[in-house]
From Swiss-Prot:
Family according to the record: Belongs to the cytochrome b family.
Localization of this protein: Mitochondrion inner membrane
Pfam families per record: Cytochrom_B_C, Cytochrome_B
Gene: MT-CYB
Membrane topology: Multi-pass membrane protein
Protein name, entry field: Cytochrome b
Length: 379
């Protein structure tokens, strides 16, 4: 008799996706981040669900309800900090996942890559709206500043901002709708992740060499499931160290001050995982130009398949491109640092140079380096 997992309509889908899936025999730990992202998403949905049971999306009680969760609800503090730091872990895994895709040329799977970009935007939107919910100073002013950017859109900008706010400023209507969207979007992310996986399984996984590995596949289970469990344990270890020892390390102290529309914090800044994009936004003096640069800093990923000039897929055997890739990583870390600094000399010029370099590396330097490498190898 054939095994039920290979015949049952539902079990068959699970089997073909997570058990008997043919995987390349040489994929490294950089291929662990997909499963880690699923773990992060499930953790965020579960902790978020329990937080939503006690949270009230009203400007008067929102801040107190978060305090109530931490002080009075059984294990509320750990649920709250797991959710807040879980978001940080989510973005660390996301950026490493995208970085892996750029390094090893996984963007040549265009459908999978484009769904991934949509996923990135959706997760960023979800995280932004979640940051508004505790209704601290940084929540309120972050929401005001970031939503206000839409007013840079010609003709409809101002009306659009007021439509999103549900009034003439960030207020109760804004908080309520942000809570509604913050609750529903993770399920949209879950659905998109399933589509992402569907497209990936049409082509099969890439591998570090970038060479077609159809002749040398191994089943996902037990080889890569056990490897994923190791990654998951490390993820949980780092998360628990953060939550139990320094839960506010990555947060902003200003968010422990209740939102006050009459008092502006000295430095308005988003969560650390948006600082690189925020630095790019601030480096352009023009409002519309800044907003365009902000959107393009992520959307630029969509044109990477068109900019691929190398005869090889990944960067494993391309030393010049490797140097540029790590320069890009260093540049992004610089932008993250600049995004958290006040707008004054020398931070302004450093931010502008780092922003120009970011676009230069992706649009100009890597494609040119790839052509040089092709010529060196006489391809």
């Amino acid at each position: 008799m054939t095994n039920i997992r290979k015949t049952h309509p539902l079990m068959k889908i699970i089997n073909n996706s997570f058990i008997d899936l043919p995987a390349p025999s040489n994929i490294s730990a950089w291929w662990n981040f997909g499963s880690l992202l699923v773990i992060c998403l499930i953790l965020q949905i579960l902790t978020g669900l329990f937080l939503a049971m006690h949270y009230t999306s009203d400007t008067i009680t929102a801040f107190s309800s978060v305090t109530h969760i931490c002080r009075d609800v059984n294990y509320g503090w750990i649920i709250r900090y797991l959710h807040a730091n879980g978001a940080s872990m989510f973005f660390i895994c996301l950026y490493m996942h995208v970085g892996r895709g750029l390094y090893y040329g996984s963007y040549t799977f265009t459908e999978t890559w484009n769904i991934g970009i949509i996923l990135l935007f959706t997760v960023m939107a979800t995280a932004f709206m979640g940051y508004v919910l505790p209704w601290g100073q940084m929540s309120f002013w972050g929401a005001t500043v970031i939503t206000n950017l839409l007013s840079a859109i010609p003709y409809i900008g101002t009306d659009l901002v007021q439509w999103i706010w549900g009034g003439f400023s960030v207020d109760k209507a804004t908080l309520t709708r942000f809570f509604a969207f913050h609750f529903i979007l993770p399920f949209v992310v879950l659905a998109l992740a399933a589509v992402h996986l569907l497209f990936l399984h049409e082509t099969g996984s890439n591998n570090p060499t970038g060479i077609v590995s159809d002749s040398d596949k191994i089943p996902l289970h037990p080889y890569y499931t056990i490897k994923d469990i190791l990654g998951a344990l490390l993820l949980i270890l780092v998360l628990m160290l953060l939550v139990l020892f320094s839960p506010d390390l990555l947060g902003d102290p200003d968010n422990y001050i209740p939102a006050n529309p009459l008092s502006t914090p000295p430095h308005i800044k988003p969560e650390w995982y948006f600082l690189f994009a925020y630095a790019i936004l601030r480096s352009i003096p023009n409002k519309l130009g800044g907003v365009l640069a902000l959107v393009l800093s992520i959307l630029i990923l969509a044109i990477t398949p068109l900019l691929h000039t190398s005869k090889q897929r990944g960067m494993m055997f391309r030393p010049i491109s490797q140097c540029l890739f790590w320069l890009l990583v260093a540049d992004l870390l610089t932008l993250t640092w600049i995004g958290g600094q006040p707008v004054e000399h020398p931070y302004i010029i450093i931010g502008q140079l780092a922003s120009v370099l970011y676009f230069m590396i992706l649009l100009v330097l890597i494609p040119i380096a790839s052509i040089i490498e092709n010529n060196i190898l006489k391809w």
